[in-house]
Amino acid sequence: MEPKDFKVIIIGGSVAGLTLALSLNKIGIDYVVLEKRAHIAPQEGASIGILPHGGRILEQLGLFEAVERSIEPLHTAHIRFPDGFEYTTASPSVLNDRFGLPLAFLERQKMLQILFDAQTEKSKILCGKKVTKIEDFEESMTVYTEDGSTYTGDLVVGADGVHSQVRTEMWRLAEKMQPGIVSNTEKSSMTVQYTCVFGISAAVPGLVPGEQVASFNDKRSFLTFPGKNGRVFWFLINRLDQEHSYSSAPRFSMKDTETICHQFLEDIIYGDVRFNDLWSRKEVCSVTALEEGAFRTWSYRRIVCIGDSMHKMAPNTGQGANCAIEDVAALANMLHACVVTTERHCKPTTKELSTLLEGYTKRRFHRIKKIYQASRLVVRLQARETLLLRMMGRYYIPRSGDVPADVASKMIAGAVALDFLPIPSRSGPGWISFKTMESRLRYWIVGGAIPVLLIMSMWLWQVVL
């Protein structure tokens, strides 16, 4: 069997889908990308952060140089609290030194354009293809689109985001063939407790390119990333009055965006900069509910879902796109081993492919679960959700030295890369050294933060009594 005899149908032409297309192209596996939008890189006001583990994979694919031309590398982080206390850390530079790649922040539209421009077979990237149904024909899959087209292949990959049609179809087929295999508890596990207003503004005096700012406030936080030519990418993450299930989450309009933002125009971002300085200079902005969840069941037979369709996180840790890129690398590695390097004379059977995908899911979920839990903690820490989190954010973290950078380094170092392409020569020593730091980091976290919280708890208990 030749690799080109195996065909992958990729649903979704965003970061994960286009990265997977490039990866499959490198190993000679056939594919088609079906994107429901009319254009591959629309301007929606969104931005994207690329951390070293995502950047390393993009570098393997020959893309990171184009990313670097579009960014102002982050080197400094400022943190502000509502009592006026501010502190500065060199964590972005520390991570750059450890891993050889800068923290990059750019327009999502630009990132998508870079990914599309790199495609050598653009005829395989099809827009205006909204998927309506997927059918399992035992040893092949057929995808149906709204315009009446059909596409048949050996594997369907859902890279179609948090509102994934592929996930819905996977659950439908699983219930039809093996009732109860995906529990209702899992299906309803995604929740919404925060909204996110995100935008891009013209340069603001006082916000310096390469210096990110996190402004902690009660029940909300601001994240700002001044980039190339001073343009500022920003997020306002605001806690809702109650937690909603995914199916009952509120939907927002542009009018809602203004209503939310006008409440906080006088909030200080950093120094003398107020949120109104960003709002009055905005070029584009939008609002969305922030879904949070990490599903356990990523695959069924010849369908697998990746990226936001399986794990959705708040943007505070910047892990969303990077985890999706990692998913792609791990899946491409699996397909390379299964289809390309083995001397087999026929395609993998449904049973063989299903077993491989179950192993893929188990490995990815083991890693994603930890990152997802960290993301949940950080968004609540920055929104000062509880008294203990307020105390930890205000008093422990500013005095914890490089511990936050060490924790981030451990997460980065544990990432997968494409094993069929060379590791970039610019990789730093952190990829190896921080893979061996798990026990040491656990000591710092348990031996540092937990006792501090216990002491605070005892003090608060005495005050109450």
Swiss-Prot record:
This is FAD-dependent monooxygenase olcE. It is a single-pass membrane protein. The 15-deoxyoxalicine B cluster is a rare cluster that contains its own geranylgeranyl pyrophosphate synthase (olcC), in contrast to other related clusters which rely on a FPP/GGPP synthase localized outside of the cluster. Its EC number is 1.-.-.-. It comes from Penicillium canescens. Its cofactor is FAD. It comes from the Eukaryota. FAD binds at residues 35, 49, 108, 308, 321. Pathway: Secondary metabolite biosynthesis; terpenoid biosynthesis. The chain crosses the membrane at residues 9-29. GO terms for biological process: terpenoid biosynthetic process. Disruption phenotype: Abolishes the production of 15-deoxyoxalicine B. Keywords: FAD, Flavoprotein, Membrane, Monooxygenase, Oxidoreductase, Transmembrane, Transmembrane helix. One of its GO terms (molecular function) is FAD binding. It is found in: Membrane. The lineage of its organism: Eukaryota, Fungi, Dikarya, Ascomycota, Pezizomycotina. Belongs to the paxM FAD-dependent monooxygenase family. InterPro entries: FAD-bd (IPR002938), FAD/NAD-bd_sf (IPR036188), FAD_mOase_fung (IPR050562). GO terms for cellular component: membrane.
